[in-house]
Amino acid sequence: MTIDEKYMRRCIQLARNGICHAAPNPMVGAVIVRDGKIIGEGYHVRCGEGHAEVNAIASVKDESLLKDATIYVSLEPCSHYGKTPPCADLIIRKGIPRVVVGCVDPFSLVAGRGIQKLRDAGIEVTVGVLEKECRELIRAFVTFNLKKRPYITLKWAQSADGFLDIRREDGNAVRLSTPLSTLAVHKMRAEQKAILVGRRTALLDNPSLTVREWYGQNPLRLVIDRQLTLPTHLHLFDGSTPTLVFTEKEKAATQILTYVTLDFGQNILPQIMQVLFYEQKIQTLLVEGGSQTLQAFLEQGLWDEAFIEHARVTLHDGIPAPLLPHGQESRFFFRDGALIQHCRHAE
């Protein structure tokens, strides 16, 4: 590991602290080093507030040290005026002689302009240190801005013989997730801006789709209910957090419920993506079920990663689990006795 890589890893570590609040901005971390010592560091905490570079510079107790320092930043410093002034201008104004950048910002208003501005000011700029890891940090930001849709994560648990649940019209579902996996799901929910289920899952499982076993904000709850036949006593309609209902009916919104009319004679998933991108500005989406909903996302290529918990339980019959497309590479690990499969969409 080189010296630059060591400090860039710290940038990445810092950036992840913004996972719940930085969106729709990307997660970014910055570290300022002089004579082999960190003299300042920061990350982008919340959209509309100071960027990572601003917070790192503000943390330096003696600004005179900046004249001989290097600033490491996981993403190219911005060069345009948004909700805050350009970070590239701040770096130039503070007289920092060297900048190390993890990856170029793909956002059209930046896209290399920040780096060029720094170089035009006579600053030494190194680009591409731990580039893959730094791009990993901003994958949701990139997907949202380039594909015009949320970054989509699919999640389900299935039995050892490939079923999501027994066939039932009511009653309790078979418990497949371990307590630790349930905790991991709540962490995942806290990191998402919206969470979606189909009508059958909402009816039979009556999920809350809230964050209860982890710290964080509740995501926007989404449910597909074509005919508006879901009973109002379900947890989705309890008012604890907003819910958006996709339907073919026309219905006025309430304080806690928003109804979005779709053309169910056409493919509804692209319509949902348009609503989430253009109207709701949702950058990340977690799809929790059920089987038909998950399979529809898979078949239409509307997914970016999937987490599948393979339980030890066998059901012998029931609702078949979704099938991942062929050619997808997965990594596997054990968690609390269950086999977890993590797959990234290979396009």
Show where each model-derived region lies.
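Enzymes that bind and transform nitrogen-containing heteroaromatic metabolites
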Residues: 1-26, 41, 61, 65, ...
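Zn2+-dependent cytidine deaminase-like catalytic core
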Residues: 32, 37-133, 220, 296
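Helix-turn-helix
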Residues: 29
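Short, flexible helix/strand-to-coil boundary loops that buttress conserved ligand/catalytic motifs
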Residues: 103, 138, 168
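N-terminal pre-triad scaffold of radical SAM enzymes
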Residues: 69-79, 147-158
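Short low-complexity, flexible loop/linker segments enriched in glycine and/or proline
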Residues: 114-116, 140-143, 211-213
